[in-house]
């Protein structure tokens, strides 16, 4: 949950913005959007995969829509090609909640890596668990920097990436 909350903040969601999300997932997907005073908009799911339906995403886009949050369910990745094409067409960001599909592939890409930010929960009731925690992945350096700030209360702990000089390691 905290990882998805950080992801929403990192992509720049602001109060009043809309984020399209699936209704078929843990409530945290929607509540992380509410944390930033944004509005979760539920799109329908594909009855074959239970993942977000790209056509329903398109039907729910408004002038306030800023992002799409997919949740990969039952070990299946969402249709990321169609979803990313919609996102590109409407200049939207994409977050992937991949807690229920770690290790899944979509067209030779690992689930969670085809979005602007991918999240993997490690909560005790997920497929991979450590009791608590999570993993976020992105190939965008600006998002990575923002994620580090959000997760650490805006404090930059390591600025030079020289981990050898840290006494606490």
Give the positions of each predicted feature.
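Short, conserved alpha-helix that lines the donor NDP-sugar binding/gating region
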Residues: 4-8
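PLP-dependent aminotransferase-like
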Residues: 9-98, 105
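Active-site nucleotide-sugar/metal-binding loop of Leloir-type enzymes
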Residues: 60-62, 110-115
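Short, acidic/glycine-rich phosphate-metal binding loop used to engage nucleotide
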Residues: 1, 45-47, 108, 124
């Amino acid at each position: 949950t905290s990882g998805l909350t950080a992801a929403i903040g990192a992509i720049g969601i602001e109060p009043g913005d809309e984020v399209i999300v699936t209704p078929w997932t843990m409530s945290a997907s929607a509540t992380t959007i509410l944390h930033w005073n944004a509005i979760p908009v539920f799109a329908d799911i594909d009855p074959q995969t239970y993942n977000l339906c790209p056509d329903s995403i398109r039907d729910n886009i408004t002038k306030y829509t800023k992002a799409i949050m997919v949740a990969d369910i039952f070990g299946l990745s969402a249709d990321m090609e169609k979803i990313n094409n919609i996102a590109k067409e409407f200049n939207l960001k994409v977050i992937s909640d991949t807690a229920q599909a770690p290790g899944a592939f979509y067209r030779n890409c690992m689930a969670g890596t085809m979005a602007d930010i991918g999240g993997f929960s490690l909560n005790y009731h997920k497929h991979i668990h450590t009791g608590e925690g999570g993993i976020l992945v992105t190939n965008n350096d600006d998002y990575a920097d923002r994620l580090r700030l959000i997760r650490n209360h805006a404090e930059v702990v390591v600025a030079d990436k020289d981990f050898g000089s840290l006494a606490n390691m």
